[in-house]
Design a protein with these regions (language model features):
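Extreme N-terminal starter segment of soluble prokaryotic enzymes
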Residues: 1-4
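Short acidic-hydrophobic, aromatic-tinged amphipathic segments that line or gate anion-handling sites
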Residues: 143-148
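Short, well-ordered coil/turn residues at beta-beta hairpins
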Residues: 6, 89-92, 168
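Phosphate-binding site of ATP-dependent enzymes
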Residues: 19-20, 149-165, 169-204
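Extended, domain-scale alpha-helical bundle/helix-rich regions
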Residues: 7-11
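Conserved N-proximal alpha/beta basic substrate-recognition cap immediately N-terminal to
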Residues: 12-142
Length: 204
Protein backbone atom coordinates (compact mmCIF):
# COMPACT_ATOMS: atom_id res chain seq x y z
CA UNK A 1 0.00 0.00 0.00
CA UNK A 2 0.93 3.64 -0.40
CA UNK A 3 0.73 5.25 3.02
CA UNK A 4 1.02 8.95 3.85
CA UNK A 5 1.57 10.49 7.28
CA UNK A 6 0.56 14.14 7.76
CA UNK A 7 2.63 14.98 10.80
CA UNK A 8 5.11 17.31 12.48
CA UNK A 9 8.63 17.78 11.07
CA UNK A 10 10.65 14.55 11.01
CA UNK A 11 13.62 16.28 12.62
CA UNK A 12 11.59 17.05 15.77
CA UNK A 13 10.76 13.42 16.60
CA UNK A 14 11.88 11.85 19.85
CA UNK A 15 12.76 8.35 18.56
CA UNK A 16 12.56 6.61 21.93
CA UNK A 17 8.93 7.53 22.56
CA UNK A 18 7.28 8.84 19.40
CA UNK A 19 4.17 6.84 18.45
CA UNK A 20 4.06 8.16 14.87
CA UNK A 21 7.59 6.87 14.29
CA UNK A 22 6.43 3.44 15.42
CA UNK A 23 3.59 3.48 12.89
CA UNK A 24 5.97 4.53 10.12
CA UNK A 25 8.52 1.90 11.16
CA UNK A 26 5.88 -0.84 11.20
CA UNK A 27 4.61 0.25 7.78
CA UNK A 28 8.15 -0.03 6.40
CA UNK A 29 8.64 -3.44 8.02
CA UNK A 30 5.50 -4.66 6.24
CA UNK A 31 6.77 -3.47 2.89
CA UNK A 32 4.45 -0.52 2.37
CA UNK A 33 5.54 2.60 0.50
CA UNK A 34 5.67 5.46 3.02
CA UNK A 35 5.55 9.20 2.49
CA UNK A 36 5.53 11.94 5.11
CA UNK A 37 4.41 15.54 4.88
CA UNK A 38 3.36 18.43 7.11
CA UNK A 39 0.32 20.70 7.17
CA UNK A 40 2.40 23.53 5.72
CA UNK A 41 3.23 21.38 2.69
CA UNK A 42 -0.33 20.77 1.51
CA UNK A 43 -1.39 22.60 -1.63
CA UNK A 44 -3.93 22.60 -4.45
CA UNK A 45 -2.77 22.76 -8.05
CA UNK A 46 -5.18 22.66 -11.00
CA UNK A 47 -7.99 21.64 -8.62
CA UNK A 48 -5.96 18.65 -7.37
CA UNK A 49 -4.98 18.40 -3.70
CA UNK A 50 -1.24 17.75 -3.52
CA UNK A 51 1.52 17.57 -0.95
CA UNK A 52 5.20 18.38 -1.05
CA UNK A 53 6.12 14.97 0.34
CA UNK A 54 9.22 13.16 1.52
CA UNK A 55 9.13 9.64 0.12
CA UNK A 56 10.89 7.03 2.25
CA UNK A 57 13.52 5.20 0.20
CA UNK A 58 12.97 1.47 0.65
CA UNK A 59 15.80 -0.34 2.40
CA UNK A 60 16.99 -3.86 1.56
CA UNK A 61 16.65 -4.66 5.25
CA UNK A 62 14.57 -2.46 7.53
CA UNK A 63 16.22 -1.98 10.96
CA UNK A 64 14.46 -3.83 13.76
CA UNK A 65 14.23 -0.93 16.20
CA UNK A 66 12.47 2.41 15.61
CA UNK A 67 15.52 4.28 16.90
CA UNK A 68 17.90 2.70 14.37
CA UNK A 69 15.30 3.03 11.63
CA UNK A 70 15.03 6.75 12.40
CA UNK A 71 18.79 7.24 12.13
CA UNK A 72 19.08 5.37 8.83
CA UNK A 73 15.94 6.63 7.09
CA UNK A 74 16.56 8.33 3.75
CA UNK A 75 13.94 10.37 1.90
CA UNK A 76 13.52 11.83 -1.55
CA UNK A 77 11.32 14.86 -2.09
CA UNK A 78 8.40 14.58 -4.45
CA UNK A 79 5.14 16.42 -5.12
CA UNK A 80 2.34 13.84 -4.88
CA UNK A 81 -1.47 13.90 -5.17
CA UNK A 82 -3.12 12.98 -1.86
CA UNK A 83 -5.74 10.95 -3.73
CA UNK A 84 -2.92 8.67 -4.91
CA UNK A 85 -2.45 7.21 -1.43
CA UNK A 86 -4.36 4.20 -0.12
CA UNK A 87 -4.25 5.44 3.48
CA UNK A 88 -3.54 8.81 5.09
CA UNK A 89 -2.72 8.97 8.79
CA UNK A 90 -3.46 12.37 10.30
CA UNK A 91 -0.78 12.64 12.99
CA UNK A 92 -0.31 16.40 13.33
CA UNK A 93 -0.28 17.53 16.95
CA UNK A 94 -3.31 19.42 18.31
CA UNK A 95 -4.76 21.96 18.01
CA UNK A 96 -5.59 20.97 14.45
CA UNK A 97 -5.64 23.56 11.71
CA UNK A 98 -9.10 23.67 10.12
CA UNK A 99 -7.47 24.39 6.77
CA UNK A 100 -5.82 20.97 6.90
CA UNK A 101 -9.22 19.37 7.44
CA UNK A 102 -10.53 21.33 4.45
CA UNK A 103 -7.74 19.88 2.31
CA UNK A 104 -8.70 16.39 3.51
CA UNK A 105 -12.38 17.07 2.78
CA UNK A 106 -11.49 17.23 -0.90
CA UNK A 107 -10.20 13.64 -1.00
CA UNK A 108 -12.06 11.89 1.85
CA UNK A 109 -14.22 9.89 -0.59
CA UNK A 110 -11.14 8.60 -2.43
CA UNK A 111 -8.73 7.77 0.39
CA UNK A 112 -9.09 5.99 3.73
CA UNK A 113 -8.20 8.63 6.35
CA UNK A 114 -7.24 7.82 9.95
CA UNK A 115 -8.85 9.44 11.87
CA UNK A 116 -12.10 10.35 10.14
CA UNK A 117 -12.20 14.03 9.18
CA UNK A 118 -15.54 14.69 10.90
CA UNK A 119 -14.31 12.87 13.99
CA UNK A 120 -11.25 15.12 14.09
CA UNK A 121 -13.49 18.19 13.90
CA UNK A 122 -15.71 17.02 16.74
CA UNK A 123 -12.90 15.89 19.03
CA UNK A 124 -10.36 18.61 18.29
CA UNK A 125 -9.76 19.41 21.98
CA UNK A 126 -10.63 18.37 25.51
CA UNK A 127 -14.10 19.96 25.39
CA UNK A 128 -15.29 16.88 23.50
CA UNK A 129 -15.16 14.59 26.54
CA UNK A 130 -15.90 17.32 29.09
CA UNK A 131 -19.36 17.81 27.58
CA UNK A 132 -20.26 14.11 27.59
CA UNK A 133 -23.11 12.91 29.78
CA UNK A 134 -21.89 11.31 33.00
CA UNK A 135 -24.62 12.05 35.54
CA UNK A 136 -23.10 9.85 38.26
CA UNK A 137 -19.62 11.27 37.83
CA UNK A 138 -18.15 7.78 37.71
CA UNK A 139 -16.19 8.19 34.47
CA UNK A 140 -15.46 11.87 33.82
CA UNK A 141 -13.88 13.89 36.67
CA UNK A 142 -15.67 17.07 37.73
CA UNK A 143 -14.55 19.57 35.13
CA UNK A 144 -14.68 23.35 34.97
CA UNK A 145 -13.91 25.11 31.69
CA UNK A 146 -13.85 28.90 31.47
CA UNK A 147 -11.81 31.96 30.56
CA UNK A 148 -13.50 33.91 33.36
CA UNK A 149 -10.66 34.33 35.84
CA UNK A 150 -12.81 35.42 38.81
CA UNK A 151 -15.13 32.46 38.35
CA UNK A 152 -12.21 30.02 38.26
CA UNK A 153 -10.70 31.60 41.37
CA UNK A 154 -13.98 30.97 43.22
CA UNK A 155 -14.05 27.38 42.00
CA UNK A 156 -10.51 26.78 43.27
CA UNK A 157 -11.18 28.57 46.57
CA UNK A 158 -14.23 26.47 47.39
CA UNK A 159 -12.89 23.15 46.14
CA UNK A 160 -12.85 20.60 48.97
CA UNK A 161 -10.22 18.33 47.43
CA UNK A 162 -6.57 18.77 48.36
CA UNK A 163 -5.51 18.53 44.72
CA UNK A 164 -6.82 19.81 41.41
CA UNK A 165 -5.56 19.28 37.87
CA UNK A 166 -5.08 22.31 35.61
CA UNK A 167 -4.58 21.84 31.89
CA UNK A 168 -5.00 23.69 28.58
CA UNK A 169 -7.83 22.67 26.24
CA UNK A 170 -5.31 22.13 23.47
CA UNK A 171 -1.93 20.51 23.67
CA UNK A 172 -0.64 16.94 23.79
CA UNK A 173 1.66 14.58 25.64
CA UNK A 174 0.94 16.13 29.03
CA UNK A 175 2.15 19.57 27.95
CA UNK A 176 0.95 22.28 30.32
CA UNK A 177 -0.67 19.86 32.80
CA UNK A 178 -0.02 20.60 36.48
CA UNK A 179 -1.27 19.40 39.85
CA UNK A 180 -2.46 22.30 41.98
CA UNK A 181 -2.15 21.41 45.66
CA UNK A 182 -3.99 23.24 48.40
CA UNK A 183 -0.78 24.64 49.87
CA UNK A 184 0.26 26.13 46.53
CA UNK A 185 -2.93 28.01 45.74
CA UNK A 186 -1.46 31.36 46.73
CA UNK A 187 0.00 31.74 43.21
CA UNK A 188 -3.29 30.93 41.49
CA UNK A 189 -3.49 34.38 39.84
CA UNK A 190 -0.34 33.88 37.81
CA UNK A 191 -1.32 30.31 36.94
CA UNK A 192 -4.70 31.41 35.61
CA UNK A 193 -3.05 34.18 33.61
CA UNK A 194 -0.73 31.57 32.12
CA UNK A 195 -3.64 29.40 30.95
CA UNK A 196 -6.17 32.07 29.99
CA UNK A 197 -3.87 34.33 27.98
CA UNK A 198 -2.20 31.44 26.20
CA UNK A 199 1.34 32.46 27.16
CA UNK A 200 2.11 28.82 27.73
CA UNK A 201 2.36 28.01 24.03
CA UNK A 202 -0.46 25.53 23.48
CA UNK A 203 -2.46 26.84 26.44
CA UNK A 204 -5.81 28.57 26.17
Amino acid sequence: MNVCFIMYPWETLTPASDSTLRLIHESALRGHQVAITTAANLTIRDSVTMSFSRLLVKQAKVPKTPETFYKKAVFKEQMLPLAGFDVIFMRANPPLDNLVLNFLDSIKDEVFIVNDVEGLRKANNKLYTAAMDDAKGSIIPRTFVSKNKEYLKRVIEHEASDKMIMKPLNGFGGSGVIVLERGARSNVNSLLDFYITGKGGESN
